Amino acid sequence: MHIQTNRLILREFTNEDFDALFEILSDSEVMKYYPKPFDVDRVKGWIKWNQENYKNYGFGLWAVCLKDSGKLIGDCGITIQNIDGKLLPEIGYHIHKDFWQQGFASEAAAVVIDWAFENTKYDCLYSYMKYSNVPSYKTAQKIGMKKLKEYPDEKN
């Protein structure tokens, strides 16, 4: 599976992506809104979880790579999450901090939304984030998402 934009290629993760993904998901700034940055085992598990999602659902979080160089700069895609007691399709994204404020998250997320509506049964996607995650909230707004509800869930 490959999705392309003007600047990006989104593709399935492989085990060879570990080093680049570890650099992103182990960074305390990137993972500020998670309980803690990911360690080696958690990143390996993240890749495996997404590979299982590709098999089980036909989607997951995909590697976000620069089109001109192939450099992996993040992830973006759809996962099934328990939101308010319901299993719902959630769009998520993480971008390497060296590539923040350049529109890569919104560019990747916009093409993922288009892909999801064309290739899945879903007619609605969700973005579940910690209330204080202003950058992610702004990205969600930029791609046309609307706030539906706030949850009193401190861990998320």
What residue spans do the PLM features occupy?
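Acyl-donor (CoA/ACP) binding surface of acyl/acetyltransferases
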Residues: M1-K32, C65-N156
